[in-house]
Amino acid sequence: MKISHKATVFTRLLLSVLCVSVGKPNHMNKNEIIQYVKDHPSGKVKIALTDIDGILRGKYISTEKFFSVVDSNTGFCDVIFGWDSNDVAYDNVTFTGWHTGYPDAPAKIDLSTFRKIPWENDVPFFLGEMIDKDGQPSCVCPRQLLKKVLADANAEGYLPFFSQEFEWYNFAESPQSVHDKQFKNLTPLTPGMFGYSILRSSLQNPFFNDLFDLLRKFNIPLEGLHTETGPGTYEAAINYAEIIEAADRAVLFKTSVKEIADRHNCIATFMAKINENLPGCGGHVHQSLWDKSGNKNLFYNEKDSMKMSGLMKNYIAGQLYCLPNILPMFAPVINSYKRLVEGAWAPTTLTWGVDNRTVALRVLSATNKSCRLETRVIGSDVNPYLAMAACLASGLYGIKNKLKLKQPASIGNGYKDFSNGTLPKTLDEATQMMKKSTVAKEILGEKFVEHFVQTREWEWRQHLKAVTDWEYKRYFEII
């Protein structure tokens, strides 16, 4: 999927006039936002933030409550960072638990994230982020982690532009029906594989068009939307933006797709690997660094044989070096590793290449405007804040330490290029590498790594306790 990766100053001004955001989610000032909230007939506001798994956790508050906290703090129970994706409390994390009593944690509403939810009568919506009792960024909040890494980039004079693309499966089911069927024999939205199919998108035209149009109205503009290989599978590329806005869009995209799907009597899933016989779902992140003015792509060098600047080569070397140490940021759950298998459009080796879809890091450097790096390890099950933070932090590590890109670009089948090693094969293996890694703590912060590793160790333990269908089929009668 080609994602154009920078506009000229003129184009950016034009987009502002057209109210399509490049780096900002809205074009209303604080007074205009406040007035909109006052005037909205619903009398309520929706606010949300993500937990460690990227799940959007939020609530409605009254307009009166909103006005009382908009210039100070609101609060969420800190169990948001003390339980897993199924709301089961961790028994091994230090940050919060029964030992702390699960107190409220302060959260700040970010007015710059203001949006109107078009499928909820344009009710006002805001994202927030956790802070600690001293008003400092919370060490476990994913959005705060990304802001910390961004500050490191800005301090060096870099303006990161990012975007994410997602693949996902759609089923003609409901949340109730998939549970009633125990997630077996589900009916896909459309049968057959049909990648890039005009026919299949036309057969589900209302849903397909609603995705494109409603997401744009919610300020998640798409560059492209098409069917992907797999029954009922879609792929969307979100327009690039400055990194915080890009991550906000990606986080909101996943929840928005699920809500829009429900309006069309179907259910969307962003599991990385839904079936061993079907392709997995990627969540590739595209990235480039620009100068502070946003006018010069620092990754591009016309004189280089591969059109890559020395800075880009340092950045790639940093990602390759850090990747085995931070893989859970890109592959966060048990199922993630079912996707990372040979010959399934997901990488398995520590490789890079130019326009090569078999490697971990794909360089696209044809033009100054579009020159960027695509990190293909990332699955659709990822927390975008964490994935983008890890991409940027590891790239900056390579720049800061002037790492040389000594490894040659993989030509042809990257699955067979073992010259730099392979990716960890399970969540446990990857988590233990991250736990022991000094570089992970250096680039992401010791307190964050401690908490994140504890949550991944919990996830692995839950998996070990589970009795699977495979075990029943294999052992129930014969053993």
Predicted feature residues:
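Short non-domain terminal segments
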Residues: 1-2, 8, 181, 450
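Short, low-complexity, charge-dense intrinsically disordered segments
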Residues: 2-22
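Cationic, low-complexity basic patches in intrinsically disordered or flexible, solvent-exposed regions
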Residues: 25
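Glycine-rich, acidic/polar active-site loops that bind/position phosphate-bearing ligands
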Residues: 28-479
